[in-house]
């Protein structure tokens, strides 16, 4: 799988500067998506290796391949391919008619996607402090460049600069944590660190105190750095500005792919902490380090649930609203991760998978709305948002007024995605939240369960606000008058553009998964159950 990604990466590095004038950026994206799909198939094929159950160390122990890491690698690469396949804006007829209405495609986009995918897959299997830091930086640097690819857009460049500066701060925290752990233990491999601290903790209190403070503080710094990168509250302030400033096609990547790799890495780190750090105590208290780690995740979970829901109520820009929605979902993921039982890990994996698919489908639908609206009404959609160089982006919720009448299937698909995010039965999002809440109540976290239920009810209001705008609000006729008075070219009704067949197939397939999951839930649920058991019994 890594070999396939490396071959694709090297091929693009050579092809983009040599053939960029003869090969369109869309073709580069299609080639990259094929590489990602083939790599995902290779990853899934590796699940048949029996020795993966207990894990296999590769590259001198820098990476530790397990069943969970291989399965999530395949899912991550497959999800990345879905996002890339949604790039093709409209039909070739519209592209030939005018190039001003099409998203400005950039050949380097596919190259940055491969760099990010490479870093994410390496992070999933990292078992060493060095490989962990290099993997997260490979993923992060590519994402920083990805956020600023649209250098002619003031909002995109400012968002990318903010992302780079604050992301560098989180990387510095992670590096400081690794330095503390290495200075107190002299080791970089996670398994060796777990074993050393467990052995020294059983000798005497004096020997244990030598390692406890530094190692625990180092772990806390690493955890805070990763929570910063997944936009967990109260370290979330950068996320709404960045997600709203960059183009939608980039936002769809930022909100999904980096989070998958980081959350699964935290899952494997959590399993190691549970098994080997029970004897480690803080120098300023009697709580064990696993309790401190769990409290860190629980505090971030509660704050993410509350802030992501309450602040999202006042948003009128759709990508900022979805950013706060993402923060709220991060709270559910952290809650399931902190409980760390078989049931909670199963719910964690299931929630991560369903949220990724639902989130990707939501942004694919927003892209489709933007493509169709910008070409079917006028070439001056930037009048709605003059600061955006990307004229096909949906910036405001009000831009979706009356779209159910214009595009009923897209409107229905978006409504189903929003209902799933709100946790309305019988959609897939309901079962994900139900599993997290069941595991939290079964583990005795009743207060957190009540908070999660309340914020789920409250968050449904801003999802319903979008649905109300799509279904019941009428379009503003003054907008058409402004476009006409500007003497712009308006497309005739018989010349209305459509999205590509691949784009529509992706939307319909993901929507069917969201809706029809209830008819055959055992496929995904059994897979998550087996992955969760592999962490506890191997």
From Swiss-Prot:
GO molecular function: NADH dehydrogenase (ubiquinone) activity
Main location: mitochondrion
Matching InterPro entries: NADH-Q_OxRdtase_suN/2 (IPR010096), ND/Mrp_TM (IPR001750)
Gene Ontology biological-process entries: ATP synthesis coupled electron transport
The keyword Electron transport belongs to this UniProt entry's keyword annotation: yes
Pfam families to which the protein is assigned, alphabetical: Proton_antipo_M (PF00361)
Subcellular location: Mitochondrion inner membrane
One GO cellular component term noted in the UniProt record for this chain: mitochondrial inner membrane
Topology of the protein relative to the lipid bilayer: Multi-pass membrane protein
Transmembrane segments: 1-21, 33-53, 70-90, 102-122, 129-149, 163-183, 215-235, 249-269, 296-316, 321-341, 348-368, 412-432, 447-467, 505-525
Similarity-based family: Belongs to the complex I subunit 2 family.
HAMAP family documented for this protein: NDH1_NuoN_1
Protein name listed in UniProt: NADH-ubiquinone oxidoreductase chain 2
Native source organism of the sequence: Mycosarcoma maydis
Lineage, highest ranks first: Eukaryota, Fungi, Dikarya, Basidiomycota, Ustilaginomycotina
